[in-house]
Swiss-Prot record:
It is found in: Secreted. This is Invasion chromosome antigen T. Signal peptide: none annotated. It comes from Shigella flexneri serotype 5a (strain M90T). The lineage of its organism: Bacteria, Pseudomonadati, Pseudomonadota, Gammaproteobacteria, Enterobacterales. The keyword Secreted applies. Disulfide bonds: none annotated. Keywords: Secreted.
């Protein structure tokens, strides 16, 4: 299913530069869009090309609402899908428009979003460090973010203050619900000169971090090359980049503060941090499964539910409970090992 994306659009109208039936030209735009993520173009330019790609990938020839996508007065566009036959487009506060789109078209748009936004930031060096941790968490499969947790993606490029002046705000926000309904978010922001990336669980107002691991941004800045910094005006305008990776355990809440001199091997730190987060997620998942098995056993037998061959059923569920318990202990051991290794590298963990 195509994830929902929302875009603040403050640019002028887009030219009708692509023949909708010409796959070569569409592929050319796809490649051009990919090339923008090399640290030399601003995110606003990338978003304009993304809109152009989506507009043409839908391939609707006679829909009168299509012109609204190119209207320079439009400031907000929401693109999503709830079924296999349509893509919905909401413009400002208007009722959403439904446009027919086949599965292949929608997969094209989804692929572009997945490959070129989730895994890209302005600064190539910084991107490689930050997202190596995210890839480690999801076993190298960035599609896990979309397919296993949520299908919601949101982009916000600019916001306006009371005087009408625009300024960068959330450059990229993906948010959604995990399988147990907790709010999870990945955020890249630029606020008051501080840029940061975060991955973690948020409380109900979707703003405050509920639990996780924090890394001081000054520790990362020094590892970004001068070439990468000079290539991006957005990066130069900021004094530091913060990267926050948050553990996903239901009972785990730690803050990791790094001073610059401690982060001698940033890639090793991020790799171990990624593994620790993944193992902690698996610990939480194993606890969930264990509790579920215990609940089944309690329901079937403590309440004397009438089942065929209750002794065999009880034995089966007890065996399953033992397996889940062993998996839980195994993941807890692996998680603790990664935390110990991180501590040996100079990472300080303080429970809060």
């Amino acid at each position: 299913m195509l994830p929902s994306i929302s875009i603040n659009n403050t640019s002028a109208a887009y030219p009708e530069s692509i023949n909708e039936n010409n796959n070569d030209e569409i592929n050319g735009l796809v490649q051009e869009f990919k090339n923008l993520f090399n640290g030399k173009e601003g995110i606003s330019t990338c978003i304009k090309h993304l809109l152009e790609l989506i507009k043409n990938a839908i391939r609707v020839n006679d829909d009168p609402y299509r012109s609204n996508i190119n209207n320079p007065s439009v400031t907000y566009i929401d693109i999503g899908s709830n079924d296999t036959d349509h893509i919905t487009i909401g413009i400002d506060n208007q009722e959403p428009i439904e446009l027919p789109a086949n599965y292949k078209d929608k997969e094209l748009v989804r692929t572009i979003i997945n490959d070129n936004i989730v895994e890209k930031t302005h600064d190539i060096n910084n991107k490689e460090m930050i997202f190596s941790a995210l890839k480690e968490i999801y076993d190298g499969d960035p599609g896990f973010i979309f397919d296993k947790i949520s299908h919601k993606l949101r982009h916000t490029v600019t916001e306006f203050d009371e005087s009408g002046k625009s300024e960068p705000t959330d450059l990229f926000t993906w948010y959604g619900k995990d399988k147990k309904g907790d709010s999870l978010a990945i955020v890249i922001k630029n606020k008051n000169g501080n840029d940061y990336l975060s991955l973690g669980y948020y409380d109900q107002d979707d703003y405050h971090i509920q639990r996780g691991i924090r890394i001081n941004g000054d520790s990362l800045t020094q590892y970004c090359s001068e070439n990468a910094r000079s290539a991006s005006a957005w990066f130069e305008s900021s004094k530091a980049i913060m990267a926050e990776s948050f553990a996903t355990g239901s009972d785990h809440q730690v803050v990791n503060e790094l001073n610059g001199e401690r982060l001698r091997e940033p890639n090793e730190v991020f790799k171990r941090l990624g593994r620790a987060i993944r193992y902690n997620f698996q610990v939480d998942d194993a606890k969930f499964r264990r509790d579920n098995v215990k609940e089944i056993i309690s329901t079937l037998f403590a309440n004397k539910v009438d089942v065929d061959h209750p002794e065999n059923k009880y034995k089966d569920f007890k065996n399953l409970e033992d397996k889940v318990e062993k998996r839980l202990q195994n993941r807890q051991t692996k998680y603790q090992n990664e935390i110990n290794q991180l501590s040996a590298l100079g990472v300080n963990f303080d429970d809060i």
